[in-house]
């Protein structure tokens, strides 16, 4: 069973066709969060059809001072690039002590049927004190897969 398989075609579906994948643009690596302020991480523009949106935000504790605490974190998918959306979200109230270089990741998934062309945004929000938090852009993304 361990043999190579040659596909008849090496081309991927054209953007917007069934099976097409769109990988969203991502903000600059190391961008700092402001506590309590939403940050736009990535966005994709999708066309009519049924899509799975897969979002991931990875962030790192970039610096700490006395008693650093991550109070809560959340990510969301929606059409706004300035506010957290109710379309789909993943939230945690943690109130945990953090250390320098701690890495935290959150994921969100949504299946959408759309009848027009829309841009969806992956937003992140962190509430923290006595530390700074930065985006790990190479590991953060928003991807859309057309399934129908």
Per-region residue spans from a language model:
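Extracellular jelly-roll beta-sandwich "head" domains, especially the C-terminal globular C1q domain
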Residues: 1-148
């Amino acid at each position: 069973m361990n043999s190579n398989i040659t596909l008849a075609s090496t081309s991927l579906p054209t953007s917007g066709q069934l099976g097409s994948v769109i990988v969203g643009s991502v903000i600059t690596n190391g961008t700092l969060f402001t506590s309590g302020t939403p940050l736009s991480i990535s966005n994709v523009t999708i066309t009519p059809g049924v899509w799975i949106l897969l979002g991931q935000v990875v962030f790192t504790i970039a610096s700490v001072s006395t008693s650093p605490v991550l109070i809560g974190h959340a990510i969301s998918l929606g059409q706004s690039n300035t506010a957290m959306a109710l379309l789909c979200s993943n939230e945690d109230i943690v109130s945990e002590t953090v250390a320098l270089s701690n890495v935290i990741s959150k994921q969100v998934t949504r299946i959408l049927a759309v009848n027009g062309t829309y841009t969806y945004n992956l937003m992140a929000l962190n509430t923290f004190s006595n530390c700074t938090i930065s985006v790990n852009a190479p590991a953060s993304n928003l991807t859309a897969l057309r399934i129908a």
